Amino acid sequence: MSHIPSELKYATSHEWIRVEANGEAVVGITEHAQDLLGDMVFVDLPEVGKQIGAGDDCAVAESVKAASDIYSPVSGEIVAINEELEGSPELVNSDPYGAGWLFRIKLDDAGELANLLDAEGYQNLVDEE
C-alpha cells in the first residue's frame, strides 16, 4: 500500500502539491503513480517562467514501462524545477514526496486548492483503481 502524506493535497491524475507560506507550492507525482510507472529513466520538466493552467500537461515522466504526462494541479507560473532529476530521475522513485519533487509554482489562485483531494480522498481514489 502506498504512503499518502496527510499534509499534502492531491489531483485525481496522481500529482501532489505542498503549499508553502510564501504563496508558492511544490509539485510531484505520488508514490502510487511512480509504482505504476516503474523505474524512471528521464523526466522532462517545464520551463521556468512558463504560465500554466490547472489541469494542463506540463511535464513528462519516462520510465522503463511508459511515458506519462504530468499535469499541474493548479494554475500559476513555474518558478523553479528540480534540476537534480536531470542526472538522477530515479529520485522520483526513491523519494517521491521529498528529493523527487518536480517543480515549484507560484499560485495564481489559492482557491483552486479546494478542487483537490485530501489524503483520505486520494486513498479512496487509489483503492477504487
From Swiss-Prot:
GO CC list: cytosol; glycine cleavage complex
Cofactor(s), by name: (R)-lipoate
InterPro entries: 2-oxoA_DH_lipoyl-BS, Biotin_lipoyl, GCV_H, GCV_H/Fam206, GCV_H_sub, Single_hybrid_motif
Keywords assigned: Lipoyl
Residues modified as N6-lipoyllysine: K65
Residue ranges constituting the Lipoyl-binding domain according to the UniProt record: 24-106
Cofactor remark: Binds 1 lipoyl cofactor covalently.
Key word Transcription regulation present: no
GO biological process: glycine decarboxylation via glycine cleavage system
Similarity field: Belongs to the GcvH family.
Subunit structure of this chain's protein: The glycine cleavage system is composed of four proteins: P, T, L and H.
Function: The glycine cleavage system catalyzes the degradation of glycine. The H protein shuttles the methylamine group of glycine from the P protein to the T protein.
This protein's name: Glycine cleavage system H protein
